[in-house]
């Protein structure tokens, strides 16, 4: 991607302030698409007509979680199986003078305008309709690297109500427009084109998801660490997260890093259903041996579904569902974790380059999306036991984890597994 063809975030914000459209593209490892984005309170009927003619995608409006609650924009479905967890709500039309079927450029403009108007309320909209609201995650692109969050962040940065209009751009033949076509559209209509990656970097410098709360020393059976607790700034649940730090990160030498999500059953009670406790112990031991490193402990129990739902998933697994199917039966994706908070903690600690302890390739993509450089993946090799072998095979076969599940599990006793902890 030519840097000369990508505009600065500042220039795009200025255009949004002036009521212009911009093009926002994401990473080729994600959707590899471009969207027209505008501040919703600056939209005109002419702009809506232009977008429907030139973009050809689905006209959506990104709103904050709070705004969605205010307008009673409930999820479109209770069980979201969207590939990228796009958070659609029920579609709406404005109930306003001059609005007829809801589909005309003027009608859709009125709906967009009213979604952005702070004085609008739930009764101002009919359901379903022709505009598709999307709920952006609190924390914006620092929590989820998607066009939905980018639209809300950019509208707010432009001084507008944090509500953004967005629409995927399609090629003339109906296929998704990729970078070469998007650059032609940029030149043809004199539009700014930016990347979500650059927006993430911009927001990382100005917006905090976490703040240091307290720091202390913590001797453990795996070694001595500095323990730093972080408070979440943008999380409605106000969760705290931990960093176990060893050594100094002031040099450019890559740091050994483990980003570990909470697993109370495995980390504390040595559950044999998973390998989490063993991975935690192994990571701390490897960091101690290296003499320098950090373990980030994120409160994302059950791959993000929470402890109660994880235990419900265990019951489903006992009925024959695998770990992915159990999550889906409960209405969740296989993995709901986000790594934005972990990325900000690493940035706060001064980590620039890392050797990442993980078996999960999505974790690599997730962290790199926040501008962190991963120079090496360091595997965590834990021997399966007779209880968790099927679970690990599912993570390998369905979730892409790089795990060697070949072992003589008949020789792995519960005592052996506890000893590894």
From Swiss-Prot:
Residues holding Mg(2+) 1: 31
Binding residues annotated for Zn(2+), in chain numbering: 263, 274, 276
Binding site for D-ribulose 5-phosphate: 30-31, 35, 144-148, 168
InterPro entries (UniProt xref): DHBP_synth_RibB-like_a/b_dom (IPR017945), DHBP_synthase_RibB (IPR000422), GTP_cyclohydro_II (IPR032677), RibA (IPR000926), RibA-like_sf (IPR036144), Riboflavin_synth_RibBA (IPR016299)
Keyword Magnesium: yes
Residues of the active site: 335 (proton acceptor), 337 (nucleophile)
GO molecular function: 3,4-dihydroxy-2-butanone-4-phosphate synthase activity; GTP binding; GTP cyclohydrolase II activity; magnesium ion binding; manganese ion binding; zinc ion binding
Pfam families attached to this UniProt entry: DHBP_synthase, GTP_cyclohydro2
Keyword Zinc: yes
GO cellular component: cytosol
Entry protein name: Riboflavin biosynthesis protein RibBA
Gene: ribBA
């Amino acid at each position: 991607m030519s840097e000369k063809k990508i505009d600065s975030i500042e220039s795009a914000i200025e255009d949004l302030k002036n009521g212009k459209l911009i093009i926002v593209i994401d990473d080729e490892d994600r959707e590899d698409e471009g969207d027209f984005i505008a501040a919703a309170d600056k939209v005109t009927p002419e702009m809506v007509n232009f977008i429907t003619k030139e973009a050809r995608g689905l006209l959506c409006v990104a709103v904050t979680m709070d705004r969605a609650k205010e307008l009673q924009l409930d999820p479109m479905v209770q069980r979201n199986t969207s590939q990228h967890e796009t958070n659609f709500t029920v579609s709406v039309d404005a109930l306003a003078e001059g609005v007829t079927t809801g589909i005309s450029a003027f009608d859709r403009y009125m709906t967009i305008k009213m979604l952005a108007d702070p004085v609008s309320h739930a009764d101002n909209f009919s359901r379903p309709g022709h505009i598709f609201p999307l709920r952006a995650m609190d924390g914006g692109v620092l929590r989820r690297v998607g066009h939905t969050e980018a639209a809300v962040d950019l509208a707010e940065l432009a001084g507008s109500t944090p509500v953004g209009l967005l629409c995927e751009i399609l090629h003339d033949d109906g296929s998704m427009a990729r970078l070469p076509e998007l650059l032609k559209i940029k030149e043809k209509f004199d539009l700014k084109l930016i990347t979500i990656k650059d927006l993430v970097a911009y927001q990382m410098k100005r917006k905090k998801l976490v703040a240091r709360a307290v720091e202390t020393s913590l001797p453990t059976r795996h070694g001595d660490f500095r323990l730093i607790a972080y408070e979440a700034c943008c999380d409605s649940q106000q969760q705290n997260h931990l960093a176990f730090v060893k050594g100094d990160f002031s040099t450019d030498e890559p740091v050994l890093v483990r980003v570990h999500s909470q697993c109370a059953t495995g980390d504390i009670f040595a559950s044999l259903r998973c390998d989490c406790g063993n991975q935690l112990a192994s990571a701390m031991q490897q960091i101690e041996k290296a003499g320098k490193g950090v373990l980030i402990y994120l409160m994302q129990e059950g791959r993000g579904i929470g402890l109660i739902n994880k235990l419900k998933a265990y019951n489903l697994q006992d009925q024959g569902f695998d770990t992915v199917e159990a999550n889906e039966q409960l209405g969740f994706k296989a993995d709901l974790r986000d790594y934005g908070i972990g990325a900000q903690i690493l940035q706060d600690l001064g980590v620039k380059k890392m050797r990442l302890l993980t078996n999960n390739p999505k974790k690599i993509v997730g962290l790199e999306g926040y501008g962190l450089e991963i120079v090496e993946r360091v595997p965590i090799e834990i021997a399966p036991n007779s209880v968790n072998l099927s679970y690990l095979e599912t993570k390998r076969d369905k979730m892409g984890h790089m795990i060697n599940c070949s072992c003589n599990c008949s020789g792995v006793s519960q005592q052996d597994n506890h000893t590894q902890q």
